[in-house]
Every structure is written in structure tokens, then in C-alpha cells.
Amino acid sequence: MAGLTLKQQRFADEYIISGNIEQSAVKAGYSRSYARGNAHKLMANVSIKAYIDERLEVLNSE
């Protein structure tokens, strides 16, 4: 998906696997302190949310 950084894409992929916002942010490369205080902002990002929705649609159709 265009518009996402590699770190944002990693976050989204990790979130699809775990469902845990903070853990996904850390695994994607964000610092623990950022993840603790700001991971919810990643989920509010329209591009990230669209990427997650698209990936889930593909996974659910398989």
C-alpha cells in the first residue's frame, strides 16, 4: 500500500498477528516509551487502518 513507511507496515502486520497495539509497535521498531504513550495514534492513521482492513480481507478470503 502506498503511503506507509516500512515501520508503519511492520506495525500493521504485527497487529494483524497479535492484536496488541503496544506490542506490535515495539516489534515494528518503535521505542517502548513511544509505544506505551502513542501506539493508539498509529491505529488512528487512516492509511494504516486501510492497510489492515485490506490485509484482513485477503486473509479472510483464503
Where are these regions (language model features)?
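N-terminal, charge-rich alpha-helical recognition modules
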Residues: 1-62
